[in-house]
UniProtKB/Swiss-Prot annotation:
This is UvrABC system protein A. It comes from Thermotoga maritima (strain ATCC 43589 / DSM 3109 / JCM 10099 / NBRC 100826 / MSB8). GO terms for molecular function: ATP binding; ATP hydrolysis activity; DNA binding; excinuclease ABC activity; zinc ion binding. The lineage of its organism: Bacteria, Thermotogati, Thermotogota, Thermotogae, Thermotogales. The keyword Nucleotide-binding applies. The UvrABC repair system catalyzes the recognition and processing of DNA lesions. UvrA is an ATPase and a DNA-binding protein. A damage recognition complex composed of 2 UvrA and 2 UvrB subunits scans DNA for abnormalities. When the presence of a lesion has been verified by UvrB, the UvrA molecules dissociate. Residues 308-566, 586-913 form the ABC transporter domain.
């Protein structure tokens, strides 16, 4: 069968649709936000492919995997095993790096174990172990036959002592001579040694001529010398004075440091064998920051010790202790004597100070909430003082290939690593050992280059990757695995990609297809849509207005019949996102000087205020480093007196021209299903107040807290207002089952009896934003927030949709709506990180209107963006580059979109030309 046929799909908002998908083709599913693209691709095709694959496993294997629910679909024909590559699975494990996620690091560990050269961790001397036979071979290769040689056993190197005991032992064993500090003595004639001076002592095991006929004697003497020299032997050519030291163990002849056996495990920072003993392979340690636990202005009794504020007994106890030292506990902390401050912070033998106490709480608590509270308020991550952030122990870091240890290698960018491997000088034997291994590493690195990630390093922590980067890493890993006959489902792989890199990504997707796979991509990017073999357009609107197939066929068919869908109208040029031709002029500017965070090259950036600013540049050029990691925390610390860690810079000028700062990124709006769009935007407070004002609620004496699913009283106690019950499966992932008592409605029966216009509180949470907007159109306080949610393109989202099920783009737009509903000051600076993620052309148009509205009120909007429709609407562009990683971090161009389009050095300008 050469196609996948989906019949009667009804998952979420899909309207019983039937779709035919050609196999072994690149298929793009597109449509406005919330139209049902992911419902078809992820929740129907992928979910059923996965479920059928798991059903084919044995009952024994299935018990560990749990039961996957069958999607609501009549049937799917021609399905193969499916692999999903989505945006949500950015790793939160601090041990994961780009190297471990792509499995390249596993290959590197083998490479270093096989051909790495060990060095002494103390003195850096190369270490090598050789068998007796190899030493013999080496002697004949290094010295001329007929040379006079001494075979010596090193006894001590630069050590104090008289060595009387050793000398007596050597006499009893029948040895004749010994070398002390370069002089050879007969053992019976050794002078008295000064025990306070350092001596180098070597036992002379044999003196002979290097000849083939002496081979057996040499072998015996070498063995004897190894035994006496504890694994070391020195051969000296008496004629030339040249010496060679050999060892049968990896051990330093000077420092006497033994070296563990070199295995791949030695290079794993997740194994106690290779990890740094201090940070256990994390590269950082959690430490209590003394400045965060103390409020200097207050006295101990007024609550100067912040972690003790929730238990005043602790503060009173500290007050008594300092009174014993003759100091008043009513003095502000800053006025206390230094020794008392030290005592409060670090304690003594009897008294546990605040810092060790908080450190102990963090170490011993089993409550994730407590741990999170401590980390958020009092604890900072510090680079490990032992390994310097390198994660490995010193032995692992002393093994080198061409002068680089494994950490130094992973610190290179991927393009530099490829260069390094291609220029490796290896012997014939080494090539034989690692030839295939090198090919595999190079192949996997090339796949990362193909998906536009050549600027990353393998040591980069996976937790710092954006959703788009982590998705493309997993895409590269899949190509590396070389599977065929599989259905790949990708969710917006172009996130975070500059138009320049999209072309390479499309080639990669086609490579995946040409291996014999069906590649289904949920995508809004014009280039990807134009390169598809087959297009499925879902719509026409979002939420209840979506869920239908408005078009399926090839690009050419869509362009011939553009009126069939919104996508067709935009692709054919019938509809366009207009350009705001009159560029606004700034009322002032903000200057940040000497920025050198990550790859930024000590740049000075001027940001005009009161206008719409776009920060652009290829992936890895330094956009997030500049805006999210330096400018945002630095301004927050100045304006709102926070203590956020900011990237390195020299100074900021002009911040007095703004009075409020709001950053909106793609992090989740909450980590638990209790958080949802209604609670996050605070519209739920208004709705609960409205329900409390109904006659029935007043008659029963219900206030607004009765309608909260987080508080006792109105909620269903069986599931504590969650609507489902979590069943812990011990070593399996937790399973969530609908609550038997409230049937998923979250509230008890009495609360659900209160209705407003025929709907109870649970029905309201089940409405989409657009449905609620119509329902509450006469209540201004509620309508205002819902209108903003609608304006940012979230009309299809349910008010009670758990935060855990929202995509990064949706979470960001909910945050944007939450800020837009507040009254701005007209001097607010808004920062947005790729707000167009997950948006169709039509949604981008709405978003641009919202951003213009903000700027028209006098505010400043800074957007990090790759979408040309947004960039062309900016008043001012700051283009970073020219490349990603080490080749980036410079300002390539600044100015209006028209000025950038004329700049020959700007990649962004080249693409802007075509849309202005």
């Amino acid at each position: 069968m050469n196609e996948i046929v989906v019949k009667g799909a009804r998952v979420h908002n899909l309207k019983n649709i039937t779709v035919r998908i050609p196999k072994n083709r690149l298929v793009v599913i597109t449509g406005v936000s919330g139209s049902g693209k992911s419902s078809l691709a992820m929740d129907t095709i992928y979910a059923e492919g996965q479920r059928r694959y798991l059903e084919s496993l044995s009952t024994y294997a299935r018990q560990f995997l749990g039961n996957l629910k069958k999607p609501d679909v009549d049937e799917i024909e021609g399905l193969s095993p499916a692999i999903a590559i989505d945006q949500k699975t950015v790793s939160h494990n601090p041990r994961s790096t780009v190297g471990t996620v792509t499995e390249i690091y596993d290959y590197l560990r083998v490479l270093y174990a096989r051909i790495g050269k060990a060095h002494c961790p103390e003195c850096g001397r190369p270490l090598e172990k050789k068998s007796i036979d190899e030493i013999l071979q080496d002697l004949f290769n290094s010295f001329k036959e007929g040379s006079r040689i001494y075979i010596l056993a090193p006894v001590a190197t630069e050590k104090k002592g008289t060595f009387k005991k050793e000398i007596e032992e050597f006499i009893s064993k029948g040895f004749a001579r010994i070398e002390i500090d370069g002089e050879i003595y007969r053992l019976e004639e050794v002078p008295e040694l000064d025990k306070n001076k350092r001596h180098t002592v070597k036992l002379v095991v044999d003196r002979l001529i290097l000849e083939t006929r002496n081979e057996h004697r040499i072998l015996d003497s070498l063995e004897l010398a190894m035994r006496e020299g504890k694994g070391f032997v020195e051969i000296r050519n008496v004629d030339t004075g040249e010496s060679k030291i050999f060892s049968e163990n990896l051990m330093c002849p000077v420092c006497g440091i033994g070296f563990p056996e070199i295995t791949p495990k030695l290079f794993s920072f997740n194994s106690p064998y290779g990890a740094c003993p201090n940070c256990h392979g994390l590269g950082f340690t959690f430490e209590v920051d003394p400045s965060l636990v103390i409020d200097e202005e207050k006295s101990v009794l007024e609550g100067a010790i912040i972690p003790y504020r929730w238990d005043r007994r602790l503060s009173r106890w500290v007050a008594r202790e300092i009174e014993k030292r003759g100091v008043s506990p009513h003095l502000p902390f800053k006025d206390l004597p230094e020794d008392v401050k030290e005592f409060i912070l670090y304690g003594d033998d009897r008294f546990e100070g605040v810092v060790p106490k908080v450190q102990r709480w963090h170490r011993e608590t089993e409550s994730p909430e407590m741990k999170e509270w401590l980390e958020k308020n009092f604890i900072v991550q510090r680079t490990c003082s032992v390994c310097g952030g390198r994660r490995l122990n010193r032995e692992a870091l002393s093994v080198k290939i061409n002068g680089l240890n494994i950490h130094e290698f992973t610190e290179l960018s991927i393009s530099e690593e490829l260069e390094f491997l291609k220029n490796l000088n290896l012997t014939e034997r080494e090539r034989e050992i690692v030839g295939e291994l090198l090919k595999e590493i190079e192949k996997r690195l090339e796949f990362l280059v193909d998906v536009g990630l050549e600027y990353l390093t393998l040591s980069r922590s996976a937790t710092t990757l954006s959703g788009g980067e982590s998705q493309r890493i997993r895409l590269a890993t899949q190509i590396g695995s070389g599977l065929t006959g599989v259905i790949y489902v990708l969710d917006e792989p172009t996130i975070g990609l500059h138009p320049r890199d999209t072309e390479r990504l499309i080639k990669t997707l086609k490579k995946l297809r040409d291996l014999g796979n069906t590649v289904i991509v949920v995508e809004h990017d014009e280039e990807v849509i134009r390169n598809a073999d087959h297009i499925i357009d879902i719509g026409p609107g979002g939420g209840t207005n979506g869920g239908r197939v408005v078009f399926q066929g090839t690009v050419d068919e869509l362009l011939k019949n553009p009126d069939s869908s919104l996508t067709g109208e935009y692709l054919s040029g019938k509809r366009k996102i207009t350009v705001n031709k009159t560029r606004r002029l700034p009322y002032a500017s903000l200057k940040i000087k000497g920025v050198r965070h990550n790859n930024l090259k000590n740049i000075d950036v001027e940001i005009p205020l009161g206008v719409f600013v776009c920060v652009t540049g290829v992936s890895g050029s330094g956009k997030s480093s500049l805006v999210m990691e330096t400018l945002y925390p630095a301004l927050m610390n100045l304006l709102h007196k926070t203590k956020l860690p900011a990237g390195e810079f020299d100074s900021i000028e002009g911040h007095e021209n703004i009075d409020k700062m709001i950053a909106i990124d793609q992090s989740p709006i909450g980590r638990t299903p209790r958080s949802n769009p209604a609670t996050y935007t605070k519209v739920f407070d208004e709705i609960r107040s409205l329900f409390a004002m109904t006659p029935a609620a007043k008659a029963r004496g219900y206030n607004k807290s009765r309608f909260s699913f987080n508080l006792k009283g109105g909620r269903c106690e069986a599931c504590q207002g969650q609507g489902y019950v979590k069943i812990e499966m011990l070593f399996l992932p937790d399973v969530y089952v609908e609550c038997d008592v409230c049937k998923g409605k979250r509230y008890n029966r009495e609360t659900l009896e209160i209705t407003y216009k025929g709907k109870n509180i649970s029905d309201i949470l089940d409405m989409t934003v657009d449905e609620a907007l119509e329902f509450f159109k006469n209540i201004p306080s509620i309508k205002r927030t819902l209108q903003v949610l609608h304006d940012v393109g979230l009309g299809y989202v349910k008010l009670g949709q758990p935060a855990t099920t929202l995509s990064g783009g949706e979470a960001q737009r909910i945050k944007l709506a939450s800020e837009l509903r507040k009254r701005d000051t007209g001097r607010t600076l808004y920062i947005l990180d790729e707000p167009t993620v997950g948006l169709h052309f039509e949604d981008v148009r709405k978003l641009v209107e919202v951003l213009h509205r903000l700027v028209d009120r006098g505010n400043t909007v800074i957007v990090i963006e790759h979408n040309l429709d947004v960039i062309k609407n900016a008043d001012h562009i700051i283009d970073l580059g020219p490349e990603g990683g080490k080749e980036g971090g410079y300002i390539v161009a600044t100015g209006t979109p028209e000025e950038i389009a004329k700049n020959p050095h700007s990649y962004t300008g080249r693409f802007l030309k075509n849309v202005l």
